[in-house]
């Protein structure tokens, strides 16, 4: 198994995304450019449940600040990304063919700073303290078959919503790899 950790990472050197105007109901998904989230992440991509760009991404209430401005207030600063405090991942495959992946990351509370005409400033929380977790167990079987269990979990401090998703994936092949059946439950 391999252990990777990062403490207060600075992804400032990472290539930025092109601006895209999305008028549809679904978010635009960008490729991951941060090396910590691209290296050794094959297990975490199973089932397509984990989108790493949300970790340390745009604060949950980034756009709500405009609706919370008082009379004669202007926005002084509104960070576009929640600051990542740490991230840890353990991944690898045991001799039994069991793939194990554990991921944990914490992003700090994020605040916008607003100021009124009298130079009185106040903070508006745009993202709570957030903990991201993923557990993946992937058992390889004979004939290139496999069964996987994936759990993703997001815990936020305060009144903001949490998320917990679990799924079981399966992929079965016959001896000659002629026939395949696969699917998921979750």
Name every feature range the model reports, one short phrase each.
Residues 1-186:
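Outer-membrane beta-barrel channel domains
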